[in-house]
Each structure stands twice: as structure tokens, then as C-alpha cells.
């Protein structure tokens, strides 16, 4: 599974979710969906805007973790 580590970059940049939402042009609810791992997909355009707003690379906010076996 792919994990979005947006909180880490927000803390490093001292930026609020509200500010990120305004800069990227997506709702706070959609940012929350990304942060909580509930997103089924993300547009490359949205990822680009998030990276621009946070001044980071995609690898700084995306992490791959193997699914846990139940």
C-alpha cells in the first residue's frame, strides 16, 4: 500500500492543512482522505501541486509498505 506522509512535510514546513488546501486548491476533506490512507487514487496533477506547495519531491511524502497479512 502507498502511504502519504503529508503530516511530516507540513510539520517541517510549519504549514497548516488549511494553508496547504488553499495553495493546492483541494478541500481539507480531500487532504484528510490522503493523510488517512483512504484515497483510492490521486491525480499526478494533484501530487505535483502538493509537492510544489510543500517544496518537496514525491518520494518525500509517498511511502510504500507491504500489506499486512491477516
Model regions and ranges:
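A short, Lys/Arg-rich alpha-helix, primarily the initiator
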Residues: 1-15
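Short alpha-helical DNA-recognition segment
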Residues: 15-33
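The alpha-helix within a helix-turn-helix
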Residues: 10, 21, 51
